[in-house]
Curated annotation (Swiss-Prot):
The chain crosses the membrane at residues 6-26. Cytochrome P450 monooxygenase FG08079; part of the gene cluster that mediates the biosynthesis of butenolide, a mycotoxin that shows antibiotic activity but does not seem to play a major role in the spread of head blight in wheat. Butenolide is derived from glutamic acid via a 4-acetamido-2-butenoic acid intermediate. It is a single-pass membrane protein. The lineage of its organism: Eukaryota, Fungi, Dikarya, Ascomycota, Pezizomycotina. GO terms for molecular function: heme binding; iron ion binding; monooxygenase activity; oxidoreductase activity, acting on paired donors, with incorporation or reduction of molecular oxygen. Belongs to the cytochrome P450 family. InterPro entries: Cyt_P450, Cyt_P450_CS, Cyt_P450_E_grp-I, Cyt_P450_sf, Cytochrome_P450_monoxygenase. Disruption phenotype: Results in the loss of butelonide production. Its cofactor is heme. Induction: Highly expressed under trichothecene-producing conditions. It holds the Pfam family p450. It comes from Gibberella zeae (strain ATCC MYA-4620 / CBS 123657 / FGSC 9075 / NRRL 31084 / PH-1). Its main location: membrane. This is Cytochrome P450 monooxygenase FG08079.
């Protein structure tokens, strides 16, 4: 009897090895044999779990960048996913008219229904873009500027109070600037996309109160955004995981799932409240109102479900990316010798002395400010991962970078790596150096894709540029800053987010 009990246990090891052989090795030699000549980490060539692990570690950018350093510009980072660190093929993968489609990676980011960001169907994306695109046109930015000014004024009140009342022995007050910039951008985006600010800036807290069908509720919005971003990037590497997240023994996945549920609840509550209580005529047209006015090719507006999806897209894309870039920009400007003083000199000359918050018109064409913003976008690369594209299934494949890729192959260009290529940006590519934009080359312009490229590029670029320039100009002109902590730890989800940026501030004399 004991012999029959032991025998099944003895067979477990060989059965496990046989299972692994059929699950990983056979597909490697058969399904993806056309990619066998492309180098990459062995585990990445065999399994999707290499990239899942890199994302789970919140360091995908580092794993992929290290792989390119070791294996070259064309690297397999999944069995059917090739990463190409070559600026010359950006248009071939992301440009107009090439037939490339978004991959299943984007399914992991769907919270309610497909949005303009997550939609993979070309016709559906075109319909959504027609409804939404006018809302982000340059002429719309004039209507959005008062919202930025209003919340920036509250931000200054908070920082002025800290500078006046919490100064240390050296005259500088300690500030964790990343979280305050996050509060600021959250209230701006909340006001624009949901019809009212979240109130996090005034409270100095990430907890947002809202009404649901069951009564009053609250949630930590920054935490929810961060965990949702991390889970979307991780599950995007293996979308088959999504239905099982809430049962995962790993708290990382359960927390990310809860973040998605939190955001869905918040978005539904805020949009429902806005539709039931429309604003008066005295309020400037916000982003939500402009999207509501939009019409598709058949003259139809978005329904409530699509409004929620698009508002959440603006919240997620517009908050994490912009606030992370602002925090990294502040860190490098304060940390890099001479940059803050040079920026302050330009701002002092351009902005009248009695103006606390400059208009976008005052700062949009300032040369050095533009260099600083561009260098922050390049050096930090908030969106650092390669946005995956699928070679169309109904064609003959494509030849890119000297390789032929069969239909169904996933391709991407790692933005962080391309933004740090020494053959493009020079031997000082890893340094923060705004002056490099003084004589930027055509090759560098081609390699600079902080908002992606082509028909699926970020629609919010104009809004992000206005926020970055107006907000940076405001704090840089108003305060002197010193570093309190010279390190800046990075956590990556869909965006590379500084964990904290600790500085000292004081009002300028």
């Amino acid at each position: 009897m004991a012999m029959f009990t032991v025998l099944p246990l003895i067979w477990l090891a060989p059965l496990g090895l046989i299972s692994l052989f059929f699950y990983y090795i056979i597909p490697y030699f058969w399904n993806y044999r056309h990619l066998r000549s492309i180098p990459g980490p062995l585990f990445a060539r065999l399994s999707n779990w290499w990239l899942v692990y890199a994302c789970r570690e919140k360091s995908r950018w580092k794993y992929v960048n290290d792989a390119h350093t070791r294996y070259g510009p064309v690297v397999r980072i999944q069995p059917n996913h090739v990463s190409i660190a070559n600026e010359e093929v950006i248009n071939a993968i992301y440009g107009h008219g090439n037939g490339m489609l978004k991959s299943s990676f984007y399914d992991a980011s769907v919270i309610t229904t497909y949005s303009i960001f997550t939609s993979r169907d070309r016709a559906e994306h075109s319909r959504k873009r027609k409804v939404v695109s006018h809302s982000f046109a340059p002429q719309s930015m004039r209507n959005f500027e008062p919202f930025i000014q209003q919340h920036l004024n509250v931000f200054l009140q908070k920082w002025d109070a800290m500078a006046a009342n919490e100064a240390k022995f050296d005259g500088y007050a300690d500030v964790e600037s990343r979280v305050w910039l996050n509060y600021l951008v959250l209230d701006i985006i909340g006001d624009l996309a949901f019809g009212a600010p979240f109130g996090v800036l005034a409270k100095g807290s990430e907890v947002v109160d809202f009404e649901t069908e069951k009564g009053p509720s609250s949630l930590p919005v920054i935490t929810s955004l961060s965990t949702r971003s991390e889970i979307a990037a991780t599950v995007g590497a293996l979308p088959e995981l999504k239905p099982y997240l809430k049962w995962s023994p790993d708290p990382f996945f359960r927390t990310g799932f809860n973040g998605m549920i939190n955001l869905r609840t918040l978005g539904t509550s805020r949009i429902t409240d806005r539709l039931n209580n429309p604003p008066g005529d005295e309020r400037e047209k916000d982003l939500l109102e402009r999207v509501r006015e939009g019409r598709d090719h058949k003259g139809q507006p978005f329904g409530k479900g699509e409004l929620i999806a698009e508002a959440l897209t603006v919240l997620i894309a517009g908050t994490d990316t912009t606030s992370s870039t602002m925090a990294a920009l502040l860190y490098h400007v304060v940390r890099t010798p001479g940059v803050l003083k040079k920026l302050q000199a330009e701002l002092d000359e351009a902005i009248p002395a009695d103006v606390s918050i400059p208009s976008f018109e005052m700062v949009k064409n300032l040369k050095y400010l533009g260099f600083v913003v561009n260098e922050a976008l390049r050096h930090h690369s908030t969106i650092s991962l390669g946005l995956p594209r699928l070679v169309p299934e109904n064609g003959n494949g494509v030849t890119i970078a000297g390789y032929h890729f069969a239909p169904g192959t996933v391709l991407s260009i790692p933005i962080y790596t391309v933004h740090h290529l020494k053959e493009v940006w020079g031997p000082d590519a890893d340094e923060f150096k705004p002056e490099r934009w003084e004589d930027v080359t055509q090759r560098q312009k081609q390699a600079f894709i902080p908002f992606s490229h082509g028909p699926r590029a970020c629609l919010g670029r104009n809004l992000a540029e206005m926020e970055l320039k107006v907000i940076t100009a405001t704090w840089a002109r108003r305060y002197d800053l010193i570093m309190r902590d010279d390190t800046m730890e990075i956590l990556e989800g869909l965006a590379r987010k500084p964990e904290a940026v600790n500085v000292g501030i004081r009002r300028r004399m």
